[in-house]
A protein has these predicted regions:
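Metal- or metallocofactor-binding catalytic centers and their adjacent structured scaffolds
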Residues: 1-57
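Glycine- and other small-residue-rich loops at beta-strand/loop junctions that grip anionic moieties
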Residues: 43, 81, 108-112, 135-139, ...
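Glycine-rich, aromatic-flanked loop segments that form ligand/cofactor-binding clefts
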Residues: 48-80
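Shared catalytic-loop signature of beta/alpha-barrel
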Residues: 157, 168-185, 190-271
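Conserved, mostly hydrophobic/aromatic
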Residues: 13, 46, 59, 104, ...
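Metal-dependent enolase-superfamily TIM-barrel catalytic cores that perform enediolate-based chemistry
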Residues: 67-180
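Predominant activation on well-ordered alpha-helical scaffold segments within soluble catalytic domains
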Residues: 6, 10-14, 47, 51-52, ...
């Protein structure tokens, strides 16, 4: 929670940082990792601050410390979350008419898979073939439900299915990736470079959702992207619904990715 992250930074990270007199970010981060286990979100917050300070000191954009940006803009999708088919269609059509978004994601998994799939397909049919519609199942389906649900989504023209099964069941994720043409994306299964390597080693997804906080930092998110690149896995820039600071830190990171085939969902500040 934000409260626990704040408490950990105040009680454990701050004393280390106050003792550290170095302006070497890498050395400071090494000391933090040696002293503190886990705490990915807190480590990301501290790393973001350290890199931002260093970038300001050097007078360069933060992305320059991550290798330099390869793009000046990022595509951003919009999430449709009312749960009401007609309302979601109307909201999407409004966004399309305003030329704000042409890619949409729906969070599903609360209802029986048949009901969720019917809802998604109705929206896709209303928006047409030129609009990309994706779903985030949020780990809700069993492997059997995944087989039936993803087949229906694929037949209905859905472009991507995010984390359809349990985090721990990477074998099921691999089997689904092998079985379907629609892109299967790993999200919560990725908690940094090591988990990315485990999933990539068995080609357990077509796409990786990279999130700086979930990865443990901007540098670790870059490492996840490198693992994906070496394994031939596409990338998607994810969000934990950060505010402006986390969003711009993510944007600086994602702008350095050579491959960002599925865009981003950095819409937090737009809410």
């Amino acid at each position: 929670s934000p409260e626990s992250v704040k408490a950990n930074i105040e009680h454990y990270f701050a004393p280390l940082l106050l003792q550290d007199k170095s302006d070497n970010v890498a050395q400071t981060l090494k000391s933090i990792h040696k002293a503190i286990n886990g705490n990915r979100f807190a480590k990301c917050a501290v790393q973001t601050a350290l890199l931002d300070i260093q970038a300001q000191r050097l007078g360069v954009p933060l992305s320059e410390l991550l290798g330099g940006r390869l793009r000046d803009s990022l595509p951003v999708l919009w999430t449709l979350a009312s749960g009401d088919t007609d309302k979601d269609i109307a909201e999407a059509q409004k966004m399309i008419a305003a030329k704000r978004h042409n890619t949409f994601k729906l969070k599903i998994g609360v209802n029986p898979w048949q009901q969720d799939v019917e809802h998604v397909i109705a929206i896709k049919q209303a928006l047409g073939s030129d609009i990309s519609v994706r779903v985030d199942v949020n780990r809700a389906w069993s492997e059997m439900d995944c087989i039936k649900g993803i087949q229906a989504l694929q037949d209905g023209g859905i472009d991507l299915v995010e984390q359809p099964c349990a985090i721990e069941n990477t074998d099921a994720l691999r089997r689904l990736t092998e079985r379907f043409d629609v892109a299967i994306m790993a999200d919560e299964a990725l908690t940094g470079p090591f988990s990315a390597y485990r999933v990539a080693k068995q080609y357990g997804a077509h796409v990786f959702a990279v999130k700086i906080a979930q990865s443990g930092g901007l540098l670790e998110a870059k490492e996840v992207a490198t693992v994906a690149k070496l394994a031939g896995i596409d990338l998607y820039g994810g969000t934990m619904l950060e505010g402006p600071i986390g969003t711009i830190a993510s944007a600086h990171t994602f702008a350095t990715f050579a491959n960002l085939a599925f865009g981003t969902d950095l819409f937090g500040p737009l809410l």
